[in-house]
């Protein structure tokens, strides 16, 4: 890998990896990931993707091995706390939180157990893959406990007699329910985030990073927005504009053959619900279209 190329570490496998690859493709990056390759070169930008384990990404950033990384905040904070405790470098810069990879680290207990608050965890043995995050939360609460560190299948620890409770990642809660557990306390909320190593970048790399950030912003904003078009009676235009959600002042254009109506175009940052569309129609609006946006730049 040339030091002149921007090096970005991403997760090798899993949902976070797929969503990250999709984001980069929407940003205009061309690459082909196949087989067991650990380094993938972009075909149209001076960028190399490193495909690694998710828990290696924070250290690669903190040690200055790569320039950027996409990582879940839970893994990032776990490694940061661990390295800080060991006196190792733990600095990085967060460039932006992304719109995928959402989850939460929660303490779960037996489904039949009554839970009145964190104080009920005093003296418990808690199984987890995230001992640093768990310790940070419990220390803040001033609650004594012991840790059972596991690298997988944490949810079976209570049934196996290894622990009284667990601290594990939760998305829907279905896995907890299947193992006779219930969520008791959320201790950390996480999303994917783009981070950068400390230190200076040359002008070309800095410009490329800024370009990527601008494109990411456009992709994420486009994903959250809709393009709305409709025909509106001129005498009801103000009332119709009041109904349109999360929008700047719309573009209003005359129709070629109908002087009583105008065309209204706008970008909305909120969903247009069926109820709103029905209200628009009741005011005389017609030809109402709600379209996805692929890219946008302000």
Curated annotation (Swiss-Prot):
GO cellular component terms listed in the entry, alphabetical order: cytoplasm
Reactions catalysed according to its record: 1-(5-phospho-beta-D-ribosyl)-ATP + diphosphate = 5-phospho-alpha-D-ribose 1-diphosphate + ATP
Gene3D superfamilies assigned to the protein according to its UniProt record, in alphabetical order: 3.30.70.120, Periplasmic binding protein-like II
The keyword Protein transport belongs to this UniProt entry's keyword annotation: no
Pathway: Amino-acid biosynthesis; L-histidine biosynthesis; L-histidine from 5-phospho-alpha-D-ribose 1-diphosphate: step 1/9
The keyword Glycosyltransferase belongs to this UniProt entry's keyword annotation: yes
Enzyme Commission number: 2.4.2.17
Activity modulation: Feedback inhibited by histidine.
Main location per the UniProt record: cytoplasm
Compartments it resides in: Cytoplasm
Pfam families: HisG, HisG_C
Similarity annotation: Belongs to the ATP phosphoribosyltransferase family. Long subfamily.
Functional note: Catalyzes the condensation of ATP and 5-phosphoribose 1-diphosphate to form N'-(5'-phosphoribosyl)-ATP (PR-ATP). Has a crucial role in the pathway because the rate of histidine biosynthesis seems to be controlled primarily by regulation of HisG enzymatic activity.
The protein, known as: ATP phosphoribosyltransferase
Organism: Aliivibrio fischeri (strain MJ11) (Vibrio fischeri)
Gene encoding the protein: hisG
């Amino acid at each position: 890998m040339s030091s002149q190329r921007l090096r970005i570490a991403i997760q090798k496998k899993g949902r976070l990896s797929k969503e990250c690859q999709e984001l980069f493709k929407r940003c205009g990056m061309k690459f082909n990931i196949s087989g067991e390759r650990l380094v993938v070169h972009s075909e149209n930008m001076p960028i190399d993707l490193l495909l690694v384990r998710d828990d290696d990404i924070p250290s690669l950033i903190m040690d200055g091995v790569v320039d950027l990384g996409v990582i879940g905040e839970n893994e990032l904070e776990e490694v940061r706390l661990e390295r800080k405790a060991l006196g190792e470098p733990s600095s990085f810069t967060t460039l932006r939180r992304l719109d995928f990879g959402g989850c939460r680290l929660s303490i779960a207990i037996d489904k039949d157990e009554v839970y009145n608050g964190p104080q009920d965890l005093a003296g418990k043995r808690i199984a987890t893959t995230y001992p640093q995050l768990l310790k940070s939360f419990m220390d803040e609460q001033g609650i004594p406990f012991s840790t059972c560190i596991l690298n997988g299948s944490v949810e079976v620890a209570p049934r196996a007699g290894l622990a009284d409770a667990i601290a594990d990642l939760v998305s829907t809660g279905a896995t907890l329910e299947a193992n006779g557990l219930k969520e008791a306390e959320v201790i950390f909320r996480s999303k994917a985030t783009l981070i950068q190593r400390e230190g200076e970048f040359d002008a070309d790399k800095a410009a490329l990073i800024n370009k990527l950030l601008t494109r990411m912003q456009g992709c994420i904003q486009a994903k959250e927005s809709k393009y709305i078009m409709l025909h509106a009676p001129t005498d009801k235009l103000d009332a119709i504009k009041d109904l349109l959600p999360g929008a700047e002042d719309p573009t209003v254009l005359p129709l070629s053959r109908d002087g009583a109506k105008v065309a209204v175009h706008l970008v909305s940052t909120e969903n247009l619900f069926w109820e709103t569309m029905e209200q628009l129609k009741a005011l005389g609006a017609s030809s109402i279209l709600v379209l996805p946006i692929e890219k946008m730049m302000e």
